[in-house]
């Protein structure tokens, strides 16, 4: 146990550190109007390491003790800031009772060590009691509760007053010390203590559960989860589906006493700092050199932009030969359009959705898996193993109360949700994703919990046709999917295995030559095939930096095509709705982004129309679009485009 002198020295050095490095935050807290609130004071662990390495080491090795001292130091630093404001700024702040130091460990040595930043599945007893970090996705968010925090007690013998803190391990129970903790010249031997009236501090309290990110796990590895406790200012800062990095102290929680059931200790992380990483996804690993590389690539293809575009598209699922239309559709779906708010205040989604309908062996699942690799956040599921609750949210009972656990669409918020074998889902399960696809949210009313969760998700589905595909019938008949669901997909591509001997010969030659091509390929040559990491960063970059605007010419082309489709005697009622017009705009914007532009040109509008035409079983402007399965890359696409215009 520390002596009073050591404690005062630590608090003094902590106070000095806070006043020196964080005067602006202290000033903001002082000017805040509510004295009853709990205020966070964010500090950087890397700064603490540079300024006072020994103190940083002590905070790491015994965070429970030293973080309490840091909170006391924050109150002292706040009082110094109040005095400074009164003296030099002639402003009177309001004294606050509750300030909590929140240590951001990102960018510090703790982030680079597997001992202090393990995956959730590798958390062990050795991590107990140190400051550590965990990364995961919030899958469950409990209700905000209140608990009694520290409480003052008085020794009957020497009248010494001291605080007792509740033990979260034993369900917030208060355990009195065996003897008086007064540290005077002569030790007190008192063992009886009385609570002091009106000295209880109450805190907000919330339990969440975070799960390992499935994308970093190997095949067949079950993602592990851990309980995280949020207190005071941290409560209600995250919701189900958020990606978070949590810094805190690992401890354990006793299970409830049940007859004939063995008591277990459940690992639990008491959070000190929570950082949402959803917004940071698009900024990862895009260096200035890489941006310059992208610009040089498009400078090289200034006169032949479509050839440059095709070089990018060849990098999508390179093991599958041809299928140009599908690869273009995958790229446009992942890039997406620009979300905007119309005159009535309604949000019009920017995310596109894609459905692949095809015979077995046409590469549908390959595209799904590759798209999941390209996306910064992806959830893959199959229709047979998915229920409405598994796709949206599940109401689960934990400790006598209900809470919501996130499903696939909520976990994929801000990313991609791939649903293979779409036709295997039951009809009422498919109906639950209607709202998620169009309104980008899920409204829930389960077990007395009524809420709305965000699902800004790209839905990528793959399905087999119902029996033999009949070109004379509508998509609804061939796939057994309802019209409202089909209209929500921007692109619906049909891949039919027509057993064409010429095509089979070309494909077999490609597969046999694949090994030799792979050996001869240069890694840095972007003019042939782009590697997966480069594609990921390119898609992230264009989504973040380009917000294309429609030119007058593009508007006229899209509007004329939409009117032509509506007038066509052969149009599909399920597809030719206002949603088709919105899909055309999104796809044209996505193509402009793919072409590294901020304006939607005539070429982008025509490409969007050709994608929609490929989705139509009966075309309104072209006699036959051909089979998407047999669409190959053109050697001279720019010359073909000029001929097409004339």
From Swiss-Prot:
Entry's family note: Belongs to the MCM family.
Enzyme class at the top of the EC tree: hydrolase
The protein's role, per its UniProt record: Probable DNA helicase that may play a role in DNA repair during meiosis.
Cell compartment(s), UniProt: Nucleus
Record's GO cellular component terms: nucleus
Catalytic reactions of this protein: ATP + H2O = ADP + phosphate + H(+)
Residue ranges occupied by any MCM domain in the UniProt entry: 308-511
Chain intervals annotated as zinc finger (C4-type): 155-188
PANTHER family in the cross-refs: DNA HELICASE MCM9 (PTHR11630:SF48), DNA REPLICATION LICENSING FACTOR MCM FAMILY MEMBER (PTHR11630)
Keyword annotations from UniProtKB, A to Z: ATP-binding, DNA damage, DNA repair, DNA-binding, Helicase, Hydrolase, Meiosis, Metal-binding, Nucleotide-binding, Nucleus, Zinc, Zinc-finger
Molecular function terms from GO: ATP binding; ATP hydrolysis activity; DNA binding; helicase activity; zinc ion binding
Protein name: Probable DNA helicase MCM9
InterPro entries: AAA+_ATPase (IPR003593), MCM (IPR031327), MCM_dom (IPR001208), MCM_lid (IPR041562), MCM_OB (IPR033762), NA-bd_OB-fold (IPR012340), P-loop_NTPase (IPR027417)
Residue window of motif Arginine finger: 487-490
EC number(s) on file: 3.6.4.12
Residues engaged in binding ATP: 358-365
Gene: MCM9
Gene Ontology terms describing biological process: DNA repair; meiotic cell cycle
